[in-house]
Amino acid sequence: MALGWYELKLAKDGQFMFNLKAANSQVILTSELYRSRAAAENGIASVQKNGGDEKNFEFRENKNGEPYFILKAQNHQEIGRSEYYSSKAAAQNGVNSVMNNAATTVIKDITKS
């Protein structure tokens, strides 16, 4: 099975962030903002470590009732979150995709693009 990759990039304010992308290039998890590249790389390592275990995911709903999920580290700190989905089943499929792709070691650094 083809695995996805992490895409490390700069946010507009100069901070770092990353997306986990599935093999079809779809973003399946988005990180928070980090002040340094090293902190963002630590965030990627945390997704690699924690993203394969379903107990680290928490389902939520936005104010419009659209489901999404967050991935938490062992210290219960949020590592990343999903897009909004049309149904809980679709959100569960997103969790499954993160679980299947989290262990990838491919990191595409586009901070210089």
UniProtKB/Swiss-Prot annotation:
Keywords: Repeat. The keyword Isomerase does not apply. The keyword Nucleus does not apply. InterPro entries: DUF1508, UPF0339_domain, YegP-like_sf. Sequence repeats lie at residues 11-59, 62-110. Belongs to the UPF0339 family. Duplicated subfamily. This is UPF0339 protein MS1092. It comes from Mannheimia succiniciproducens (strain KCTC 0769BP / MBEL55E).
